[in-house]
Amino acid sequence: MYARNFNRRGRGNLGSTSVSRGLTPRSYVWSWKPVNSGSDRYCYPAITDVVNQQAQFIERDRNNALNEMAHLLSTMSTTELRASGYAMAGLQIAEQRINDYCAKEVRLEAASEDMLLLSTAMRIGEIVRLDDAANDDVVRSFDLDVVGPVMGTISSQGPLELMITLRTSQKIPAHWSDRCSVSKLIFDIPFKRMLIALRDLVSYPWARPPLHQVVYLGATPRFYGRALLDSDFVDESLNQSQKDAVQLAITANAIALIHGPPGTGKTRVLIEIIRQQIKLMRKLSGTSLGVSSSGSPPHTTSAGAISNSAVIRSKQVVLSSLLNAGGRDLRGDSGYCGDFDVVIIDNATQAFEGESWIAALKAPKLILAGDSNQLYPMFKNADGSAVIAGGSLGSQPPHMTLFERVLGKHGDKVSRTLQIQYRMHADIMQVSANELYKDNIVADGSVAGHVLCDLEHVETNEYTRAPLVLLETAGRGITESLHGSGTFKGRTTMMSTGPESWINTGEAQLAMTHVEKLLAAGVDVNDIAIFPFYDAQVALLKGLGEERYPELEIGSVDTSQGREKEAVVLSMVRSNPGKEVGFLKDVRLMNVALTRARRHLCIIADSSTVSEGDPFLTALFVHLKSKALILHPST
């Protein structure tokens, strides 16, 4: 949320990007020029050291991602790239249309009825290129510097069709309708905008505001203003911990943190903060406030309708993603404080520190909301492996989040934790509450005992009465295997996202069988989700289920944060003699997985493999043995 007052403009040197072309192995270099704090009285070593460290990390992350793709291009054939999901060929254009936001959309279908479009390397939100299927070189080029004629964003995806929202209204050649291809692009604008934000942070040309001093220079956080009365709250149903969080945010001079465990109503708190801020601004200005969103949907048409920047400049409250906050529409006259009065960043624990500064530089006051026990941002190692960020609070590594840095420095002085959750049955919540939140969250009475059979039209049976179900596969011959292309019902599928992912066909079949039992009991398909822990397993399950149940949500755990369903089925996938569990031992990922379900959580797992992989997993299976309905199915 922002309040506008554009008046200044930033300056600085970002550096340069060098990309060599061709289909041979390539080396990508982004040159960040380290900043010297000696020449500027407002450029403190405590800030320049962090900025240089952050910039080098971002530079390394970006280069690793590009070099990984370059390696794939140099070692995999075009057929292998397609089979691995980085490209799709044999597509035809089924429809072109203008959507409600005046953007052009293209709906693609498989040209052959025996192919399912199940690439998991290209997800909703990915930047892709649409091109002539005959142009093989295009399929083997993934660089934004080698852009084909038509680019867009995947807006929806299913086993039988793909919807792409185009970035421009360019005309698509007629001969593409019968045969075209889609390939994944590397999108490096986020890296550039993070570096621009860090440049602006370090080259700030005036005396440092309290926000900078509190975050980096050891200043004490301060709070002003009277305490809010119960009658002051717009949402009178907020609980006391939620009201305390609103109070902290409204009275903070520079920064406040809101720690929102799963289901605790963090969004309601942020809405109340925005309402309170609007009330305050109305008192000060005596005017009403306009609201707008930035980035998507666009406010432009080919006929020359009003532009995004013009719309935004007429509003005082703006909603934006962090990435769009660094775009032209919100760049304004300055990259610095004074553009807005307050910035609120939701899910701040999923953003790198440099990413948060894209928006945070636009106001003297910052409110961060998130949960450090849920998903962190991910970065690439030099070997191409994905690593979840976050380290110990004391070490302050370059890949930590701004939320984590401030919490580590100031703790409870600037932070409030929401303590009552309104989503999960108490048995579903219990492991996370015990192991991660020190028993500081409790289930509200309205949800503590609710189960599926309490829903209208759902019959009562052993499944719908049980909040927890464990489908135990140990000793059943249901084992994992490495991913690859496969066939379901005679159709070819693409099931890969890179060098290593795992599938478990037995677990996939058990997941679908369990879903069918819930449906037979009257549970609505829209109230059910399947969340596997591996992308290849997602593709496998989509091949089994999406054609029969197109409304059934099937997605990977790492895309499920913030979502909830009445019933959730988790496929753990891993089952092997060596008891290797991979990233199942990532406690934050497991916490997200376990806290999506409201009334019914079914876990499909080989306990002999998974239960010994990590102390958190051990605690989980101890809890399941005590509280769950345990079944020993055979496929």
PLM regions and their residue ranges:
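Conserved beta-strand scaffold positions in the cores of enzyme catalytic domains, especially
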Residues: L257, K283, G290, L319, ...
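Conserved helicase/translocase P-loop NTPase motor core
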Residues: G304-C337, Q509-A511
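Walker A/P-loop NTP-binding motif
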Residues: T251, T267-R282
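N-terminal pre-P-loop "Q-motif" helix
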Residues: D235-A254, P261, V269, E507
